[in-house]
């Protein structure tokens, strides 16, 4: 049985600006096993976010292949890729990206509604997820009424609501203090343990870096195993 959830083969990404070509990533080979938690570190501007966008199918590589559970991204139409992202991938960002005009229950249930679940079923599943995260008393509140740590916990709940195989997180604790960083990482490890969810986390946060079991560093357009 193939234990690899996502794999990159000779991945390259560059951008053209007139006659000049900017190389962002060069000959990247990378793989993540199912159930692994991996961190991506590197200086600002090193290509971490671009790499995450490629892994999520939000951008196309200049050349090279990405396979998810053995399936080539390049074999999917844009419509199939959108459906794939909603079911198989979850996303957590530095800024929570919650919809400010919707309450917490509505925010978390949104990916389920997009998957054509009924409003009743979506809200029931979302409520149970928020209860798991000790947020059931916040379901009618709006993002502006929550603390930063609470908003990010809601963002994690939304990312996991479809029980994706892989969650991609870009600086998920960048705006949090150490206590809330620990809360978020504890949620990540709980989801990983309970559901075998894989995580790829780009971060500068030293508290988080110390906790992530496997680290990779992007430097000089390439990716390396990193020993902290």
Swiss-Prot record:
Give a Gene Ontology cellular component term annotated to this protein: plasma membrane
Gene Ontology BP terms: lipoprotein localization to membrane
Location comes to: Cell inner membrane
Tell me which residues bind ATP: 42-49
Bilayer topology: Peripheral membrane protein
Q: Which key words tag this protein in UniProt?
A: ATP-binding, Cell inner membrane, Cell membrane, Membrane, Nucleotide-binding, Translocase, Transport
Q: Tell me if Cell membrane is a UniProt keyword of this record.
A: yes
Main localization, broad class: membrane
By its UniProt entry, which InterPro entries does this protein fall under?
AAA+_ATPase, ABC_transporter-like_ATP-bd, ABC_transporter-like_CS, LolD_lipo_ATP-bd, MacB-like_ATP-bd, P-loop_NTPase
User: GO molecular-function annotation terms?
Assistant: ATP binding; ATP hydrolysis activity
Residue ranges annotated for the ABC transporter domain, each copy included: 6-228
Q: Does the keyword Membrane apply?
A: yes
| Enzyme Commission numbers on file | 7.6.2.-
Q: What class of enzyme is it?
A: translocase
Could you say which protein family the record assigns here?
Belongs to the ABC transporter superfamily. Lipoprotein translocase (TC 3.A.1.125) family.
Protein task: Usually LolD forms an ABC transporter complex with LolC and LolE involved in the translocation of lipoprotein, in an ATP-dependent manner. However, LolE is certainly not functional as it is frameshifted.
NCBIfam families attached to this UniProt entry? LolD_lipo_ex
Task: Provide the protein name.
Answer: Lipoprotein-releasing system ATP-binding protein LolD
Originating gene: lolD
